[in-house]
A protein has these predicted regions:
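Acidic, surface-exposed loops and disordered segments
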Residues: 1-113
Length: 113
């Protein structure tokens, strides 16, 4: 059976060595847009994306993330954070009385991120 999605999943690879070629603004926007199009729990998108451009901060992150120098060398560094504040914003936007996120909501946010 030929299935394009399965073929793409099987052809996927991790890249940890990068060229010096910068990521264009359009490529950056397309990457973030693709992330926002991914399904999330209840379509709540309980995450925030940080675009880390400061070389010193990338170097610090590389150290803190189990000494992975590819983080500092990558031409694009997006950090996905579980963000339960978005849960509260959704309540406010719906005009509903918010409740504090519980343990399960934190797990949903972590899975979304």
């Amino acid at each position: 059976m030929e299935n394009e999605v399965l073929r793409q999943l099987e052809a996927r690879k991790s890249v940890r060595v990068f060229t010096d070629e910068p990521v264009t603004a359009e490529e950056r926007r397309a990457s973030v847009h693709a992330a926002f199009m991914a399904p999330t729990a209840g379509n709540q998108q309980l995450y925030t994306i940080l675009d880390i451009t400061d070389p010193a901060l990338r170097g610090r992150m590389a150290d803190l993330c189990d000494h992975q120098p590819m983080i500092a060398a990558a031409p694009l560094c997006l950090v996905f954070l579980a963000d339960c504040r978005r849960w509260l914003e959704a309540y406010r936007m719906a005009g509903a009385a918010p409740r504090d996120p519980g343990d399960g909501d934190l797990l949903l946010a972590a899975a979304d991120a």
